[in-house]
Regions:
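Structured C-terminal helix/loop/strand segments within mature extracytoplasmic catalytic/sensor domains
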Residues: 328-377
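A short, well-structured edge-of-sheet supersecondary motif
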Residues: 58-88, 339-340, 346-350
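Active-site-proximal alpha-helical segments within enzyme catalytic domains
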Residues: 199-207, 255-276, 337-353
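Active-site helix/loop module of the DD-peptidase/beta-lactamase fold
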Residues: 95, 113-153, 182, 212-255
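Active-site Gly/Thr loop motif
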Residues: 174, 238-245, 293-348
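Active-site SXXK
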Residues: 77, 94-120, 143, 203-207, ...
Length: 377
């Protein structure tokens, strides 16, 4: 069978969900995986291969970029560079941390497309719908834009005082959504940006309650897992993806979904292609456009995803507004997890590792230098 015909058949199978881990372009390296410590690079017209290899070497070998564990770069749907640190390989699952938020946003979009949720209706949280509760004004749009107005601290000093840590690891951990949904308002919904992992757990609960009325943790877990598998994991061929749940059966949709580097790249490609796989629309283009449109209170944040836009004075730069195209966007997670997508360059870059957040800037800058080596269309 000639290579072109094989390529078309693989794409057709991907579109039907019948093709597991090969659902997206592994063809640039013919399905081969880089051995630990080795960089696999495909020559790309207009890209200086030696310079690309050198910059990737720095990312893995120089102390200021430690600890990079995996890198995958896709261009035009094909893997053009891939590398793993010793002890890791293409089968290794990596924790998402906050990259999970963007997965949760996609699940919300599927629910909206199905007519089960509405973006600007009051968020269907029963406790908020009691007469006189001001939280009844919170909408899905507010939650996706991190502007619910709920009282929240994402990072505290000491850390165990933060609402995020309390929900994930301390007094809220067994029923995370009860902790998250139980917070009072501290601002009018829609009036300010407040980055919140707890908000994504609220969205996870809202999705789950559209799937089942049961409060049984196992039933809730199964309902969400089946929905994710049928609508996202299998169509995208992300066979390694493992969502994590708390003791009450709620998806930890703000921080704990695991997948290997190639599957995270498939997720980025899915968004780069506006929710389409091989010409088949699995998520509406309008929803992806919503995710990639600046929120009112922070232009660098969309619908549960970061955008390559300047921020207000005093706020830290998130991506590369002075270096890369304005349509760049990224799912980012604690300790240096990145899925960075540049539609103008037909690129998706995944970097996974463990770098403390207070020394992460050099890693982020190095990823920008790598992306800048690729031409724009």
């Amino acid at each position: 069978m000639e290579a072109g015909m094989k390529h078309r058949i693989l794409l057709a199978l991907a579109a039907t969900g019948l093709l597991g881990a090969t659902a997206f372009g592994l063809y640039g390296i013919e399905g081969r995986a880089a051995d630990s410590g080795e960089t696999m690079i495909v020559d790309v017209p207009g890209v200086p291969t030696a310079a690309l290899n050198a910059e990737i070497d720095k990312l893995f070998n120089e102390d200021e970029f430690a600890e990079t564990r995996a890198l995958v770069i896709m261009r035009g749907g094909e893997i053009v560079a891939e590398r793993y640190a010793p002890g890791y390989d293409r089968g290794t699952r990596f924790i998402s941390w906050s990259m999970a938020k963007s997965v949760t946003a996609v699940l919300v979009g599927l629910m909206v497309a199905d007519g089960r949720l509405a973006l600007d209706a009051p968020a269907p949280v029963p406790d908020w719908q009691r007469p006189g509760d001001p939280r009844g004004a919170i909408t899905l749009r507010h939650l996706l834009h991190m502007s619910s107005g709920l009282q929240h601290s994402e990072a505290g000093d000491p850390p165990y005082d933060s609402d995020e840590v309390r929900m994930l690891f301390l007094d809220g951990r067994d029923n995370m959504v009860r902790y998250a949904e139980g917070q009072p308002l501290e601002a009018e919904p829609g009036s300010k940006f407040e980055y919140s992992t707890n908000t994504s757990v609220i969205l996870s609960d809202i999705i789950t309650r559209q799937l089942t009325d049961s409060k049984d943790p196992d039933v809730r877990r199964r309902a969400m897992l089946e929905y994710m598998r049928g609508r996202l994991i299998e169509p995208l061929g992300m066979a390694s993806m493992v969502p994590e749940f708390d003791a009450s059966g709620t998806l930890i949709g703000g921080s704990i979904i695991q997948a290997n580097a190639r599957d995270w790249a498939k997720f980025g490609e899915f968004l780069r292609n506006k929710g389409s796989i091989a010409g088949n629309q699995f998520l509406t283009r309008g929803w992806v456009d919503f995710m990639l449109t600046s929120s009112p209170n922070d232009p660098a944040y969309g619908g549960h995803i970061w955008l390559n836009k300047p921020r207000a004075a005093g706020l830290k730069k998130v991506l590369y507004p002075d270096l890369l195209p304005g349509d760049v966007f990224a799912a980012q997670g604690h300790l240096g997890q990145f899925v960075i997508v540049s539609p103008s360059q037909k690129l998706t870059l995944v970097r996974l590792g463990k770098t403390q957040d207070d020394v992460l800037d050099p890693v982020k800058e190095q990823l920008g230098r790598i992306l800048a080596l690729f031409p724009r269309d």
